[in-house]
């Protein structure tokens, strides 16, 4: 497991980096005192979770020896890595002017320029032992997040998770949906007394819907639409794409179609999840 320590001058992008690491599955803590690093790592060791912690000038130890000692106290299962973010002086000044935020050292009655310079001196012990230094002067927020994914995961884009969820319109449209498809016009197994108690996961219902050409046409056109735009969605700095399929009650048609779409994209190597809102409510 990795303990990623994120540091750098204020305004260089530590918060952006921490959010990107969280998207990559790291357990993230902002501004944790250095002396608590071993305790955090020990807590997470049994859960097999990598962690990322930001350290700025406000929680820097008084001497480098304190930091070194904390590193020696980490569980053997954790491999510490130090990421240091920086930007040139003019860029940091411009970013502070744009956001109108106070520098952490402004309480010492320093000018912004002096605060930036003093912070550089205070953080030098961390910078000198960094495993990776990234200059964010010419980077946008998205470019920084992309670079971290490339460096840490070895691939350019994060893996998009496709979520296919069924629902019933009479229960309301899911608020987390990126796309909503209405399948209430498809043949309805509800009107067959034998199929009515079943769901779209049961073989008799699957066989019923599988006999209808219009069902296959809808699934084909929907998956073709998603396939056409999926490459752009994957590069749009998002973690999830939620596709909601709705029928009247969320029990038969929407469940079947959601499962068919999920199976199709799963077979093509995509990271896919499926869930059925109405069926989950019935289990509760």
Swiss-Prot record:
Region annotation RNA-binding: where it falls in the sequence: 266-284
Coiled-coil boundaries: none
Highest taxon in the source lineage: Bacteria
Residues that hold ATP according to the record: 8-15
Any one GO molecular-function label of the UniProt entry: molecular adaptor activity
The protein's assembly and partners: Homotrimer.
PANTHER family per UniProt: RNASE ADAPTER PROTEIN RAPZ (PTHR30448:SF0)
Function, in words: Modulates the synthesis of GlmS, by affecting the processing and stability of the regulatory small RNA GlmZ. When glucosamine-6-phosphate (GlcN6P) concentrations are high in the cell, RapZ binds GlmZ and targets it to cleavage by RNase E. Consequently, GlmZ is inactivated and unable to activate GlmS synthesis. Under low GlcN6P concentrations, RapZ is sequestered and inactivated by an other regulatory small RNA, GlmY, preventing GlmZ degradation and leading to synthesis of GlmS.
Name of the protein this chain belongs to: RNase adapter protein RapZ
Source species taxonomy: Bacteria, Pseudomonadati, Pseudomonadota, Gammaproteobacteria, Enterobacterales
Recorded name of the encoding gene: rapZ
């Amino acid at each position: 497991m990795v303990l990623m320590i994120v540091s750098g001058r204020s305004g260089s992008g530590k918060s952006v980096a921490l959010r990107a690491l969280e998207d990559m599955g790291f357990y993230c803590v902002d501004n944790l005192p250095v002396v608590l690093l071993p305790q955090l790592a020990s807590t997470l060791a049994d859960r097999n979770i990598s962690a990322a912690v930001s350290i700025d000038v406000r929680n820097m130890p008084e001497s480098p020896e304190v930091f070194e000692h904390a590193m020696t106290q980490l569980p053997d299962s954790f491999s510490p890595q130090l990421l240091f973010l920086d930007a040139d002086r003019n860029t940091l000044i411009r970013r502070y002017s744009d956001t109108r935020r106070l520098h952490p050292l402004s309480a010492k009655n320093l000018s912004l320029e002096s605060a930036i310079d003093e912070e550089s001196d205070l953080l030098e012990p961390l910078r000198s032992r960094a495993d990776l230094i990234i200059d964010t002067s010419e980077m946008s927020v998205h470019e920084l997040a992309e670079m971290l994914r490339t460096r840490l995961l070895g691939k350019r884009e994060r893996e998009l998770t496709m979520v296919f969820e069924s629902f019933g319109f009479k229960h309301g449209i899911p608020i987390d949906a990126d796309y909503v498809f209405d399948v209430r016009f498809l043949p309805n197994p509800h009107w067959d007394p034998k199929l009515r108690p079943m769901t779209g996961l049961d073989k008799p219902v699957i066989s019923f819907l599988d006999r209808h050409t219009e069902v296959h046409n809808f699934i084909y056109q929907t998956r073709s639409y998603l396939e056409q735009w999926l490459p752009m969605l994957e590069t749009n700095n998002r973690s999830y794409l939620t596709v909601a399929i709705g029928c009247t009650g969320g029990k038969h048609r929407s469940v079947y179609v959601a499962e068919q779409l999920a199976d199709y994209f799963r077979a093509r190597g995509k990271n896919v999840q499926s869930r059925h809102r109405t069926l989950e409510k019935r289990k509760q």
